[in-house]
From Swiss-Prot:
Record note on quaternary structure: In absence of complement activation, the C3 precursor is first processed by the removal of 4 Arg residues, forming two chains, beta and alpha, linked by a disulfide bond.
Glycosylated residues, chain numbering: N944, N1620
Name of this chain's protein: Complement C3
Gene this protein is translated from: C3
Species assigned in the record: Cavia porcellus
Record Pfam families: A2M, A2M_BRD, A2M_recep, ANATO, C3_CUB1, C3_CUB2, MG1, MG2
Known function: Precursor of non-enzymatic components of the classical, alternative, lectin and GZMK complement pathways, which consist in a cascade of proteins that leads to phagocytosis and breakdown of pathogens and signaling that strengthens the adaptive immune system.
Length: 1666
């Protein structure tokens, strides 16, 4: 906690002294910032008085003092030592609502007939708002639950009106609500549904009290597409810094734990890098693969790798930069991956830093000086147990847990500044590397140079509530004055408020007085102690002597709040973990009457984002930031002590008072040093290392068989052990090319059909876990039970959700007496020793094959489990699970291990679809099931297409004040079929003042500050930009942005230009490029113009300026008013649009007139008839204006006339008509002239106060992005900034935005209406419709707005991009007969994988993630050979540590970008399964995890793709069995019964005309000869229809052209749109050959033919029975 970080508890000890009677003094003390709607204490004192003294305190408005805002009375008596307090409260009123200026009040205290008055600053902050969201991260389409806690400045609940907005990551508010917390006990529960189509990134909830709109409180949350991880990764360096001299390098520990507490086994990829500001340098050589065993791994960044990776590679060049380390951990099963990062590890020469932030800046000579040093690690965290010592005085101390050490030194009796140097004395670090820092303390200044001092001290740095400390008052005074000081007065101030006032007596001769002070929770988070005494000193004048000290109090809640499990007898839950769905008891302990907001959050949420949790320390940080005290104590004199402590003091003695406080913020607060190092996501890459082997090994490996059948020469390219090894390898390889080494493996895989004789739970008895919320328990509970030991307890029974995880139960309470409290999170771990973790991606694309993995965990200590696992059928997916056939496998899981079971799916339906996997253990009656939803999205790419953008300005663009717009429907010709589109209609107001602020950013003007030089013309070219830039920055108050110190530099340059220009002044006061050249009218007028503007900035001699004015009038103005040019300038480019010969007399006369008008105020007294001569020029311009044609001339002359108030009537109309599109005065192909002319026109419009015409002109000027530069830019630069500065000054804060907008959508019966108002001008209002339709808009009212219409839809992509930056080919061939296979293997195949990286250099450290087909396992001997031969093709391989090797991960050191990298190995089938599920191969680069490619493989399906039928863009699964094979004999009744089953849609007699056979599916074109039962397709007899079947059903169907068939099927088998519907022949289709007429003569067909005739007759006549 830092001294000035928040409303600290200001404990002010005011020491005051009773004096001999005779010189009464009255004083008033208030906080120097008073807060609206808050009770504030005012301290009143009287000295040397008798009798009772009535006091009235009133608070008035400032400066008028018309209203009494608060008034209180009290009486000071001898019984209270003439010390008293009153409580005042300033109500919120309209005076305090305006945005302009600081808010002040007058506090008056009338002590009898003596009146004191003090002006005090008012803060509109009347309390705090704390916002808690249920989570820190959300997916699109989910709901944000949030609570707003409304509290006053004492953190107690308050009922007030608040405004809440929700802002996009771009800072645009899209929702704004006005809400009241009255009758809500200070807790507002709210929610917001995130749209499906939403911007990803950091969103904000912002809230403020209606009466203090500047005090905005906010909470952030992230929106992204994510899936919760199953484990967390912590990256912990052994030191928080990297010490540059450390030869050991940087050691980092990696900890990986499942969310349910078990340790992770896997592989971590680690890369280090150097961060220098925003730039990151990745250290490629540091890329390492680390095995994570039992949850931990270690990695070291060596000093050499660090130095080799940077340029220049010198240690000192790295100091000041920082290191980061990125870690990605992948489970052995390949099913999940988590990234973590530790950044900001500083590279330092000293491991510590010393700060004096908590040390006062002033000392009292000859009294102890308390030095509080904060020692931090380089990352800013406190460094405990570090010895520190002062230089010179050699005082030693040790830092405490908070990093603070206290050193007390004796100061000399001198009034000179005191230099204090402190350094660390940590063992093992050379002196040169110890941290050292020096501060300078200044002496406290006494009044009248007396020797009266007061010094306060406390024993410790961080104080704990519940203890009592002694506050020491050390007195030093003139010996003959000491006896006058009889007592001290003290007061305690909390969070900017005065809490308590009292007195502490003092006996004569006591140099030290001790005040015992109990530290209560009310003093959290920090407080100040201020003391003062007063006396008539040796100078016979009244003196005040003061001191203060700041103290930190350990953070905790003021009240109590604890959440714990509560099933044991003592209220403690003894169980370490719980089962899913189990009931458990929660106990909440807190203050009676408190309301507790609860939420349970899956810990996985905080793995992804832990940044935005509400904690008690965050609450205190907010409170600290509002502290009105500003230093760690003391002050430069008595007034400085009060002011720095946040107090205002006024006495009845002249001059005895504090100065007026300048602003609400402290000049430089001593910040509370709290910092957490956050983990961020980072991607990285890895390059492998290889250790040398002897040549014999090279030869042996050369003789080994190569699975890829590469030639010896190609294999040798993979040998990286030097020339000698390559030579040996080639020699032996060539000699023994035919050598074969047979490898056998003896491992069995337990995948088989369910054994009926073993005990196992049937699938239908397993109830799947399906409730996996990321947060729940979002309730508010009231603690009503009577208190026991001051604490109330509530017991709740809750049912846990289905997730296997750890839940963090978070609680925030709000109590009327104890305020807000955030409890420590209570963790509840949920798991079982056998379970399924079904890992699903965030979303999948319809019709695109995907692999998911169900990971089965067995946490039993010693038992292997034989498990039957089943994927359940869902018609929304194509998989090996069909309506007719289950997809089960049997796997064995070893103790404390896991097995990943892959499933290949093709999603067929858009939306949220369920995937369900169940598993049962043989002989144990243990089972688990998981049902999760998978989001299926359309093919194609989501596109945001802008349909229309319109400016809304009914007064300007409408007719009769109403603007009508017709918006067309979007062109969605490229939309993916069977997908939705959404049209978003967005409305936003454009407040005019907002446009002004956005005019030109100060940052853009840096190039304008230049040094003028050259001749009389060049000097003015150089002087112009600086003068106009300073003028602009002054007017727009942007110097803070530009750099305050730069203003003086710019003024010096202007002065220089002015002085240089005087060298070119001719004896007649005119100017030319050189003294011997003819005087120039234009240049002289321009000097007048620039000097007139500069006269506000530097000292300009009026005689110089006005002499030039006289010359222009007397020498260059003709009788008719026109000015003539007899000495043209050399640099014609500098004169802008006046340069053109056309209408030059009018434009030159206007230019001179404008210059004279701008000099008028300075020269009116020195130049006779100046006004008359200006008017004469105006007469000339006015007489010529009707004939002028050039827009430039009309603009400059228009401004000249406006200056004389003569731009009106027909002249004004001509001026306005010259504007192109009402926003610019355009000169063809002359951008600079157009900018200059439009600037003159804007100045004219501002003089006319035509604020409606102004905005489009300003907008056009802003859109030009013209910041003044380049050849010929002098006039454009000068005028654009003069005009924009004038605009900033003139455009009043006229809040003219009040517009009603109505949208009439054809699909809606009534219009949607919106009102755009100033107060919420930037609020983005939106309307959305799923219909793609044109609509009409009407707008009426004042001001401007913008309408944007955007269509969001899925557009077809030009071609399918399945792979990103990788090419991948996978082949599967039967192994040759010569290959020996293990005895148990049913068959052996060779899996070939070839891949190439499509980037411009090799992809280092890439990964092949291979799912094996059901029943197959890889040949480990082949894999060993690939990994361990001297010709290494792979870096390493990993398989599940269990009996089912169904996931294989291969690590490659690189994937070439210039040629294919190929590998192949044998895979053996150890048992047969009915349907083999395809396997998959996925390649990805470690540097960029988004770069990936997946291909499938299968022994029968060439590309490993599941069978599906597609019609246009709609696909359906064809993996199910073909239609039912009919029994040989079927009766009439059976036929009728089957045809009348529910769902049968049609019954036809058909004739097959022709067959169209293809590689995927067959189409049969049939004639519908008779409609026996009509269905959804209203087909007539004689029409043709297509019947579609998958190729694999061709043989089973065996249809013949020209033959007749009886066919019926389900409505779900109809496809396409009327009138051209197609029919699927699937498992539910009836296909029966109908014998031809001649075939019916045969005896074997007679009965069938008769039955078919009767069947047809019954169906047609009677239909189906009900």
């Amino acid at each position: 906690m830092g001294p000035a970080a928040g409303p600290s508890l200001l404990l002010l000890l005011l020491a005051s002294v009773s004096l001999a009677l005779g010189d009464p003094m009255y004083s008033i003390i208030t906080p120097n910032i008073l807060r609206l709607e808050n009770e504030e204490t005012v301290v009143l004192e009287a000295h040397e008085v008798q009798g009772d003294i009535p006091v009235t305190v009133t608070v008035h408005d400032f400066p008028a003092k018309k209203n009494v805002l608060s008034s209180e009375k009290t009486v000071l008596t001898s019984a209270t030592g003439y010390l008293g307090t009153v409580t005042i409260k300033i109500p919120a009123s309209k005076e305090f609502k305006s945005d302009k200026g600081r808010k002040l009040v007058v506090v008056q205290a009338a002590f009898g007939g003596t009146q004191l008055e003090k002006v005090v600053l008012v803060s509109l902050q009347s309390g705090y708002l704390f916002i808690q969201t249920d989570k820190t991260i959300y997916t699109p389409g989910s709901t944000v639950l949030y609570r707003i806690f409304t509290v006053d400045s004492d953190l107690l609940p308050v009922g007030r009106t608040i405004i809440v907005t929700i802002e996009t990551p771009d800072g645009i508010p899209i929702k704004r609500d006005t809400l009241s917390s009255n009758n809500q006990h200070g807790i507002l529960p709210l929610s917001w549904n995130i749209p499906e189509l939403v911007n990803m990134g950091q969103w904000k909830i912002q809230a403020f009290y209606e009466n203090s709109p500047k005090q905005v409180f906010s909470a952030e949350f992230e929106v992204k597409e994510y899936v919760l991880p199953s484990f967390e990764v912590l990256v912990e360096p052994t030191e928080k810094f990297y010490y540059i001299d450390d030869p050991k390098g940087l050691e980092v520990n990696i900890i990986a734990r499942f969310l349910y507490g078990k340790n992770v086994d896997g592989t971590a990829f680690v890369i280090f890098g150097v961060q220098d500001g925003d730039q990151r340098i990745s250290l490629a050589q540091s890329l390492t693969r680390v095995v994570i065993e039992d949850g931990s791994g270690e990695v070291v960044l060596s000093r050499q790798v660090l130095l080799d990776g940077v340029q220049p590679s010198r240690p000192e060049a790295l100091v000041g930069k920082s290191l980061y380390v990125s870690v990605t951990v992948i489970l052995h099963s390949g099913s999940d991956m988590v990234e973590a990062e530790r950044s900001g590890i500083p590279i330092v020469t000293s491991p510590y830093q010393i700060h004096f932030t908590k040390t006062p800046k002033y000392f009292k000579p000859a009294m102890p000086f308390e030095i509080m040093v904060l020692v931090t690690n380089p990352d800013g965290s406190p460094a405990p147990h570090v010895p520190v010592v002062t230089q010179g005085s050699n005082v030693q101390s040790l830092t405490q847990a908070d990093g603070v050490a206290r050193l007390s030194i004796n100061t000399p009796n001198t009034r000179q500044p005191l230099s204090v140097t402190v350094q660390t004395k940590k063992g093992g670090i050379p002196d040169a590397r110890q941290a050292i820092n020096t501060m300078q303390a200044l002496p406290y200044t006494t009044m009248y140079n007396s020797n009266n001092y007061l010094h306060l001290s406390m024993p410790r740095t961080e104080l704990k509530p519940g203890e009592t400390i002694n506050v020491n008052f050390h007195l030093r005074s003139d010996p003959n004055q000491e006896a006058k000081i009889r007592y001290y007065t003290y007061l305690i101030m909390n969070k900017g408020k005065l809490l308590k006032v009292g007195r502490q007596p003092r006996e004569p001769g006591q140099a030290l007085v001790v005040l015992p002070m109990p530290i209560t929770k009310e003093l959290i988070p920090s407080f100040r102690l201020v003391a003062y005494y007063t006396l008539i000193g040796a100078s016979a004048q009244r003196e005040v002597v003061a001191d203060s000290v700041w103290a930190d109090v350990r953070d905790s809640c003021v009240g109590t709040l604890v959440v714990k499990g509560g099933s044991g007898k003592d209220g403690q839950d003894k169980r370490q973990q719980h089962l899913p769905r189990q009931q458990m008891t929660l106990r909440i302990e807190g203050n009676q009457g408190a309301r507790v907001g609860l939420v349970a959050v899956d810990k996985g949420v905080f793995v992804l984002n832990k940044k935005h949790k509400l904690t008690q320390s965050k609450i205190w940080d907010v409170v600290e930031k509002a502290d009105i005290g500003c230093t760690p104590g003391s002050g430069k004199d008595y007034a400085g002590v009060f002011t720095d402590a946040g107090l205002s003091f006024k006495s009845s003695k002249a001059g005895l008072q504090t100065a007026q406080r300048e602003g609400l913020d402290c000049p430089k607060p001593a910040a509370r040093r709290r910092r957490s190092v956050q983990l961020m996501e980072r991607r990285m890459d890895k390059a492998g290392k290889y250790k040398s082997k002897e040549l014999r090994r090279c030869c042996e490996d050369g003789m080994r068989e190569n699975p890829m059948q590469f030639s010896c020469q190609r294999r040798a390219r993979y040998v990286s052990l030097g020339e000698a090894c390559v030579k040996a390898f080639l020699d032996c390889c060539t000699y023994m090319a035919q050598l074969r080494q047979q490898h056998r493996r003896e491992q069995n895989l337990g995948l088989a059909r369910s054994d009926m004789d073993e005990d196992i739970i049937p699938e239908e008895d397993i109830i799947s876990r399906s409730q996996f919320p990321e947060s729940w328990l979002w309730t508010i509970e009231e603690l009503k039970e009577p208190e026991r030991n001051g604490i109330s307890t509530k017991t709740m029974n809750i049912f846990l959700k289905d997730s296997i995880t750890t839940w963090e139960i978070l609680a925030v309470s709000l109590s009327d007496k104890k305020g807000i409290c955030v409890a420590d999170p209570f963790e509840v771990t949920v798991m079982q020793d056998f379970f399924i973790d079904l890992r699903l991606p965030y979303s999948v694309v319809r019709n695109e094959q995907v692999e998911i993995r169900a990971v089965l965990y067995n946490y039993r200590e010693a038992q292997s489990l034989k498990v039957r696992v089943e994927l359940l059928h869902n018609p929304a997916f194509c998989s090996l699970a069909t309506a007719k056939k289950r997809h089960t496998q049997t796997v064995t899981i070893g103790p404390k291990s896991s097995v990943a079971v892959p499933y290949v799916l093709v999603p067929l339906k858009i939306g949220l679809q369920e995937v369900e996997v169940k598993a049962a253990v043989y002989n144990y009656f243990i089972s688990d099931g998981v049902k999760k939803t998978l989001k299926v999205v359309p093919e194609g790419m989501r596109v945001n297409k802008t349909v229309a953008i319109r400016t809304l300005n009914p007064e300007q663009l409408g007719q009769g004040g109403v603007q009508r717009e017709e918006i067309p429907a979007a062109d969605l010709s490229d939309q993916v079929p069977d997908t939705d589109s959404e049209t978003k209609i967005l409305l936003q107001g454009t407040p005019v003042a907002q446009m002004a602020e956005d005019a030109v950013d100060a940052e853009r003007l840096k190039h304008l500050i230049i040094t003028p030089s050259g001749c009389g013309e060049q000097n003015m070219i150089g002087m112009t930009p600086t003068v106009i830039a300073v003028h602009y920055l002054d007017q727009t108050e942007q110097w803070e942005k530009f750099g305050l110190e730069k203003r003086q530099e710019a003024l010096n340059l202007i002065n220089r230009g002015y002085t240089q220009q005087l060298a070119f002044k001719q004896p007649n006061w005119a100017y030319a490029a050189f003294k011997n050249r003819a005087s120039s009218t234009w240049l002289t007028a321009y000097v007048v113009k620039v000097f007139s503007l500069a006269a506000n900035l530097i000292g300009i001699d009026s005689e110089v300026l006005c002499g030039a004015v006289k010359w222009l009038i007397l020498e260059k103005q003709k009788p008719d008013g026109v000015f003539q040019e007899d000495g043209p300038v050399i640099h014609q480019e500098m004169i802008g649009g006046v340069r053109t010969a056309q209408e030059a007399d009018v434009s030159l006369t206007a230019f001179v007139l404008i210059a004279l008008q701008e000099a008028k105020d300075i020269c009116r007294a020195q130049v006779n008839n100046l006004e008359a001569n200006i008017n004469k020029a105006g007469d000339y311009i006015e007489s010529r204006y009707a004939d002028v044609r050039r827009p430039y001339t009309l603009a400059i002359a228009g401004y000249a006339l406006a200056l004389l108030e003569r731009l009106n009537g027909a002249t004004l109309q001509k001026f306005l008509n010259a504007a192109t599109e009402k926003n610019r005065w355009e000169e063809a192909r002359q951008k600079l002239y157009s900018v200059e002319a439009t600037s003159y026109a804007l100045l004219a419009l501002l003089l006319l106060k035509d604020f409606d015409a102004v905005p489009p002109v300003v907008r056009w000027l802003n859109e030009q992005r013209y910041y003044g530069r380049g050849y010929g830019s002098t006039q454009a630069t000068f005028m654009v900034f003069q005009a924009l500065a004038q605009y900033q000054t003139d455009v009043p804060d006229h809040k003219d935005l009040n517009m009603e907008v109505a949208l009439q959508l054809p699909s809606r019966s009534s219009p949607s209406k919106f009102r755009l108002v100033w107060e919420a001008g930037s609020l983005l209002r939106s309307e959305a419709t799923k219909q793609n339709e044109g609509f009409k808009l009407t707008a009426k009212g004042k001001g401007q707005g913008t309408l944007s219409v955007v269509a969001v839809y899925y557009a077809k992509t030009k071609r399918k991009v399945v792979c990103k930056n990788f090419d991948l080919r996978v082949t599967l061939k039967p192994a040759p007969d010569t290959v020996k296979k293990p005895q148990e293997a049913k068959s052996t195949m060779i899996l070939g994988i070839c891949t190439r990286y499509l980037g411009d250099q090799d992809a280092t450290m890439s990964i092949l993630d291979i799912s094996m087909m059901t029943g197959f396992i890889p040949d480990t001997d082949d894999l060993k050979l690939l990994a361990t031969g001297v010709d290494r093709y792979i870096s390493k391989y990993e398989m599940n540590k269990d009996f089912s090797k169904n996931t294989l991960i291969i690590y490659l050191d690189k994937v070439s970008h210039s040629e294919e990298e190929c590998l192949s190995f044998k895979i053996h089938q150890f048992f047969n399964v009915g349907l083999i599920q395809p396997g998959s191969v996925k390649v990805y680069s470690y540097y960029n995890l988004d770069e990936t490619c997946t291909q499938f493989y299968h022994p029968e399906k060439e590309d490993g793709m599941l069978n599906k039928l597609c019609h246009k863009d709609l696909c359906r699964c064809a993996e199910e069995n073909c239609f039912i094979q009919l029994p040989e004999k079927i009766t009439l009744d059976e036929r009728l019964e089957k045809a009348c089953e529910p769902g049968v849609d049609y019954v036809y007699k058909t004739k097959l005309l022709k067959m169209e056979l293809s590689d995927d599916f067959d189409e049969y074109i049939m004639t519908i000869e008779q409609v026996i039962k009509s269905g959804s397709d209203e087909v007539q007899a004689g029409k043709e229809r297509r019947f579609i079947s998958h190729i694999k059903c061709r043989d089973a169907l065996h249809l013949k052209e020209g033959k007749h068939y009886l066919m019926w099927g389900l409505s779900s088998d109809l496809w396409g749109e009327r009138p051209n519907m197609s029919y699927i022949i699937g498992k539910d289709t009836w296909v029966e050959a109908w014998p031809e007429a001649e075939e019916c003569q045969d005896e074997e067909n007679q009965q069938q033919c008769q039955d078919l005739g009767t069947f047809t007759e019954n169906m047609v006549v009677f239909g189906c029975p009900n």
